[in-house]
Amino acid sequence: MLMVISPAKSLDFTAPQTVLPLTTPELKAQIAELSKVTRKLTAADLKRLMHISDALATLNRERFQAFDPEVEEGLQAVIAFNGDVYAGLNARELDRPALEWAQDHLRILSGLYGVLRPFDALQPYRLEMGTRLKTKKGANLYDFWGETISRTLNQAAEGHADPTLVNLASQEYFGAVDAKALKLPVVTCHFKEEKGGELRVLGFFAKKARGRMARYIIDNRIDQAEALKGFDLDGYRFQPGLSTSADWVFARPQP
């Protein structure tokens, strides 16, 4: 069983260097090709493409200028990302055996890196998958990545007893997984809040819950998708009446 999560816009590189392994991102050729494009972008280009402030545009231009796909340095991706999903995952509190297990079962989808493993060396960047960045391969990053991400996930799941891909990513990022090229059955987890008799998806809670599900899988070394139905962290419960074979709904009373 393999799970995928989205990256985060915010990063935290203040974490002390650890004794954890640092692995090389798998899609080096594509990363190098894409970094040649991003290096040419001006701050004005980035502001327009990503709808960000002048300050963030300047910061990210500096990041792209400094980015070197040949340098095998950085911080482990699962440690460096710092958003709601990663607050739920709380990887900095996982011990080494748990993180080593996650290295084989967790993948992070990325606009710049394509697919990251937890220990992969991450350099500071920001490039959302939905960015309409033109390359030789097309008008946006979905065109650029094509079938590459799906093929990489297929390879990652080889040898797993249960080949199911557990989708804990956002629609923006999972949209980069080419359905025709993917050879794995997919289960997408949805997290909803109940209030006044109605169920709603609330962004902050849903993002954190995706991270909590990833943590639940890692803590319990779950390698069969059916066992996810036992997820009960933070008050969530599986809702069989609202679920299908491909879309599993978990709900709780809204805090």
Curated annotation (Swiss-Prot):
One of its GO terms (biological process) is response to hydroperoxide. It comes from the Bacteria. One of its GO terms (cellular component) is cytosol. HAMAP family: UPF0246. Belongs to the UPF0246 family. This is UPF0246 protein CCNA_03496.
